[in-house]
From Swiss-Prot:
Family per similarity comment: Belongs to the protein kinase superfamily. CMGC Ser/Thr protein kinase family. CDC2/CDKX subfamily.
Record's GO cellular component terms: cilium; Golgi apparatus; nucleoplasm; nucleus
This protein's name: Cyclin-dependent kinase 20
Organism: Homo sapiens (Human)
Gene name in the database record: CDK20
Pfam families, per database record: Pkinase
EC class name: transferase
Record note on quaternary structure: Monomer. Interacts with TBC1D32. Interacts with MAK.
A molecular function (GO) term: ATP binding
InterPro entries named in the record: CDK, CDK20-like_STKc, Kinase-like_dom_sf, Prot_kinase_dom, Protein_kinase_ATP_BS, Ser/Thr_kinase_AS
Catalyzed reaction equations: L-seryl-[protein] + ATP = O-phospho-L-seryl-[protein] + ADP + H(+); L-threonyl-[protein] + ATP = O-phospho-L-threonyl-[protein] + ADP + H(+)
């Protein structure tokens, strides 16, 4: 740490504390993520190892945050990243109104280029959300925080935990306890982020997993084996029954959004993971080639992380799984009235 001068604290994520720092010799500004170990014999935490492995296995890409160095410090170690001025969550919080369509297209285009690059390298991020999409001083968006990333198995033979992705951006198969999944979980998250940019607020702001499913089925309708054949194979299928809910047209959810945007959004927000549009294919969608065209990064808003007015939106949800099947319904739900219309009695 002697080679760096700490300039301030940026924040604290699920996988470590992040500081803004300056390299003493070169003057380069970086972001230092300090990861502590409880005991030296523990070795590196799995999530930290995944982040290092994922970033080191991928060649430099302008849409993925650059890992510059890794070094031990005290009872842990430090990751040195290129410094990014802000993140997409701050952009949404500080926007006085929904972003201009050209701005939404630009952010989404950069996100899709980063996701396409990750998926081409067999990396599933598993925690895409606005707070993990960093913004540089020049307006460039880059994907960060690969602490939950995994190299996925194309043949679907590997089992993974379903407790990944922040709840508002968590794919339905994860909410149903899926242990076998692929890049489709990232594509659902991209759809949620796109919807949030178009709407100015999250589409599915559930306070627990059941409420999250209720928000989803209120728009997509109640899932069934005819629409989603793999549904019956999921571990948590039939643990709770939902009333039949017909899909809501996206033009009613987002009445001021263009047909092209709604068409692309609808191709991300699909129950069957294999039917969701791939990031590389989405980049060729007519949405990006109709007026207004994507804005140049220099035309995008860049709010500061520190200082400025207090954010209007409340903090995002935690990663923890706070619904228990055996617990009484009223004890598991923060807002029972919101989901009661969707739940079958008895």
């Amino acid at each position: 740490m002697d080679q760096y001068c700490i300039l301030g604290r940026i924040g604290e994520g699920a996988h470590g504390i992040v500081f803004k720092a300056k390299h003493v010799e070169t003057g380069e500004i970086v972001a230092l993520k300090k990861v502590a170990l409880r005991r030296l014999e523990d070795g590196f935490p799995n999530q930290a190892l995944r982040e290092i492995k994922a970033l080191q296995e991928m060649e430099d890409n302008q849409y993925v945050v650059q890992l510059k160095a890794v070094f031990p410090h005290g009872g842990g170690f430090v990751l040195a990243f290129e410094f990014m001025l802000s993140d997409l969550a701050e952009v949404v919080r500080h926007a006085q109104r929904p972003l201009a369509q050209a701005q939404v297209k630009s952010y989404l285009q950069m996100l899709l280029k980063g996701v396409a690059f990750c998926h081409a390298n067999n990396i599933v991020h598993r925690d895409l959300k606005p707070a993990n999409l960093l913004i540089s001083a020049s307006g460039q968006l880059k994907i960060a925080d690969f602490g939950l990333a995994r190299v996925f198995s194309p043949d679907g033979s590997r089992l993974y935990t379903h407790q990944v992705a922040t709840r508002w951006y968590r794919a339905p198969e994860l909410l149903y306890g899926a242990r076998q999944y692929d890049q489709g979980v990232d594509l659902w998250s991209v759809g949620c982020i796109m919807g949030e940019l178009l709407n100015g607020s999250p589409l599915f702001p559930g306070k627990n997993d059941i409420e999250q499913l209720c928000y989803v089925l209120r728009i997509l309708g109640t899932p069934n084996p005819q629409v989603w054949p793999e549904l019956t194979e999921l571990p948590d299928y039939n643990k709770i029954s939902f009333k039949e809910q017909v899909p809501m047209p996206l033009e009613e959810v987002l009445p001021d959004v263009s047909p092209q945007a709604l068409d692309l959004l609808g191709q991300f927000l699909l129950y069957p993971p294999h039917q969701r549009i791939a990031a590389s294919k989405a980049l060729l969608h007519q949405y990006f080639f109709t007026a207004p065209l994507p804005a140049h990064p220099s035309e995008l808003p860049i709010p500061q992380r520190l200082g400025g007015p207090a954010p209007k939106a409340h903090p995002g949800p935690p990663h923890i799984h706070d619904f228990h099947v055996d617990r009484p319904l009223e004890e598991s739900l923060l807002n029972p009235e919101l989901i009661r219309p969707f739940i079958l009695e008895g």
